[in-house]
Regions:
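Short, amphipathic alpha-helical segments
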Residues: 30-34, 52, 105, 160, ...
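Non-cytosolic beta-sandwich-type ligand-binding/adhesion modules
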Residues: 1-67
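Extracellular structured ligand-interaction cores
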Residues: 35-39, 55, 103, 175, ...
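Active-site-adjacent structural segments surrounding the nucleophilic cysteine of cysteine proteases
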Residues: 43-138
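Conserved active-site-adjacent core of cysteine acyl-enzyme catalytic domains
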Residues: 117-203
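Surface-exposed intrinsically disordered loops and tails
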Residues: 8-14, 83, 88-97, 189-199
Length: 204
């Protein structure tokens, strides 16, 4: 359930075949089994008979986690890509924002920078308050993060992409948000990242 002016919240249904974890749908199945179809059901609700919500976009991204079954992403020929790209994207640090939420608003802060890069004038706190998931009790629901951009009239979606896709977006002058996992130690459970903002994170 999502909306700007309601107590929004995700759910975590689960059965023998599949489960939802906040913003991610997982196929359980036996080893080697995958899904072949995806079906959406969207319900629009309003307490005012004269007002209806507007649905502009429904999207999903997928990733096959089985070895050797990666689904390639189509991108144009990359021979013309510049070696380096520097975008003048407005920057915020979540760690110097509202002290009560600053350490946990990486997604809203990132989306704020991307929206301001496209002409908006927002603060991370106001984006965070529109994004908060009352069931998950956090700000890291990426479905809600991109829905915030949609509420301002932008077309936005989360995407399992590779480095070439990111390079094309940057070369086209479009800022990109990344969700990363890393460890500050070479012996950590995630890929090692020197001088990372957090000691170790399963998602930042």
């Amino acid at each position: 359930k999502w909306g700007i002016d309601l107590k929004r919240g995700s759910t975590d249904p689960s059965n023998a075949l599949a489960a939802v974890d906040t913003d991610t749908f997982y196929i359980k199945g036996s080893d080697g089994e995958t899904a072949s179809k995806l079906q959406f059901q969207v319900t629009l609700h309003s307490n005012n008979a004269g007002v209806t919500p507007t649905l502009r976009n429904v999207s999903a991204t997928l990733k096959n986690t089985l070895d050797g079954q990666a689904i390639p992403i189509y991108i144009p020929d990359d021979s013309a890509l510049p070696e380096k790209v520097l975008l003048d994207t407005p920057c915020y640090s979540q760690m110097v924002r509202d002290a009560s939420i600053g350490s946990v608003i990486c997604s809203p802060t990132t989306m704020t920078m991307m929206l301001n890069d496209r002409g908006m004038n927002l603060f991370p706190e106001e984006v965070a308050l529109r994004e908060y998931d009352f069931n998950y009790e956090g700000f890291g629901n990426w479905s809600y993060t991109v829905a915030i951009a949609g509420s301002y009239g932008f077309s936005a979606y989360a995407h399992y992409a590779d480095l070439d896709f990111v390079r094309h977006e940057l070369a086209a002058g479009r800022s990109v948000a990344l969700s990363v996992q890393y460890s500050s130690s070479p012996n950590g459970s995630y890929p090692y990242l020197e001088n990372g903002a957090a000691n170790s994170t399963g998602g930042h």
